[in-house]
Amino acid sequence: MPASPTATAAEIKDVNTRYHDAAADSYDAKWGIDYGEVGQAQVRGKLVKALGHEPEVFGVALEIGSGTGYFSLNLVQLGLIERATATDISPGMLATLGRSASELGLEVETVCTEAETLPFADDSFDLVFGHAILHHIPDLGRAFSEFERVLRPGGTVAF
């Protein structure tokens, strides 16, 4: 089922990109995004809820629709991700994520890409995850095929 009965996938992506680029600089303040103990506890709790159990330490993780990095940066700080790659269609959001990572002394790779066409090799990630993103993806079937393709055997998908 398409995300919109009238808009094309390209139109949906264009609107999402323009909105999030315009909002990027003030996004964290607007939504009260926290990269300290409060944010880490929130993210850990949401991951436990998605998984149905306490999380293990994941080696290489891919975040889909990372925005400013709320999940990736907090999971790296918690030591639950050893190496993170954050993706988003908004260059502005990824730039904000990069600045926040730098301020926190963290290394997170950022890649501007669509969920339906991931530029990664097969079997690249131990964890593919996202938060508050699925409603933004026009073709969920194609996106989940990509998530499965880049996930290592025995890996975890969590949304």
Residue spans of the language-model regions?
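Conserved class I S-adenosyl-L-methionine
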Residues: 2-55, 74
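Short N-terminal helix/helix-N-cap motif within the alpha/beta-hydrolase-1
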Residues: 92, 137-142
